[in-house]
């Protein structure tokens, strides 16, 4: 058995433990009773340490050196590249830091659920201080090894090849045209007569509708399921994908589009190359590409007028109000409104929420600001970008997201990168597919075949730039995103 084959076998062993960690994490968020938190945190930390020790076994260094010298096919070279990247990412961190970070993150995240509801910044800040400190330690270790800034080192975990210099350029450009576009869209919509949700929408009916929409989007229910959690997410593994949403019985909008969004993530996972399962090359390319798939479903498909016709038809099976008329649904789902909450934000204001978080987490990881500065900075940027004050309103301000509670610094840019990639994929798809006609037909297979051929089946065999260029003929071009927004909202 050559060194490459030994590395693949080892990778699959690590993936099996990762599988368990994913399912246990889903259980913690979706069904675990609150009294189980402490013991669960300890168990998960132990499992993470075991995975880390497997990924950093001393003999792996020799295996990688030997494999580099072996004659490998192009696909095997890509597999080796991705296995080595995972190994290097893990090998940089001491086991003690991995364990401490896992414990601090679990403790902070679990307490945050109640603290956020109570607007308890003081209580949250005590736990979060440790998460930030450990994240900064991790960032510095990664930065020293890679010769980058601490934030760029964290960004590299989620977005290989992306830098804050590139993001600064992209986001600075967005900031030149987004505020006026938001204001123009709001002004244009003033005459819209929208019937907003105003009634009782039982959670079980919302779930039944959501399941029908997932079926329309060809979710594979033999390899996945829908549940409920505080924060919607997609977890699990490609053969057992777990998506969640949350229900508010006074409205239906967030649960429905939340399901469409998470189904996009799930279809990507379910469509990853099965022959590469258990290896890093068989995983999603980056979080930006992952978000491009959820946002392709939610924004490019989900807000398409032909798709909204389907939503109206399916909703009539469960609800009878005029708010579910197709013209009204279209207005609801393209309504532009400046709001506090990122996950409830419309397509147009969403990038402002992401840019705000990016700028704060970049400066926090780089040591430019302290964690105690965050509420004030958040308020300043919300006022500057969306004209809203969050002073004293931590629940709807800096405490609203789950990401920072466990130290996931460097993730937020993925959302707007994803929206940009999604717009570019749609522009490319429209060159060969009558997208509106396909959606209208109710059989969306041609759309999913394109996504499978160009994105899902590639796993991480290509770099992000290679993947995007092969699929669309060019690397990331944010002009497609701007053109899409102008076309829809002006």
Labelled PLM ranges:
Residues 254-273, 291-295:
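Active-site recognition of the HExxH zinc-binding catalytic motif
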Residues 7, 143, 261, 294, ...:
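Divalent metal-coordination and catalytic microenvironments
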Residues 39, 100, 127-130, 170, ...:
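Secondary-structure capping and boundary motifs in well-ordered enzyme cores
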Residues 3, 25, 29, 35, ...:
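C-terminal, non-catalytic "cap/extension" segments appended to globular domains
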Residues 283-324:
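Post-HExxH zinc-binding segment in Zn-dependent metallohydrolases
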Residues 171, 175-178, 203-207, 213-227, ...:
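All-alpha helical catalytic cores of prenyl diphosphate-utilizing isoprenoid enzymes
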Residues 101-252:
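Contiguous, non-catalytic segments that form substrate-binding/exosite surfaces or channel walls
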Residues 1-160, 486-490:
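A well-structured
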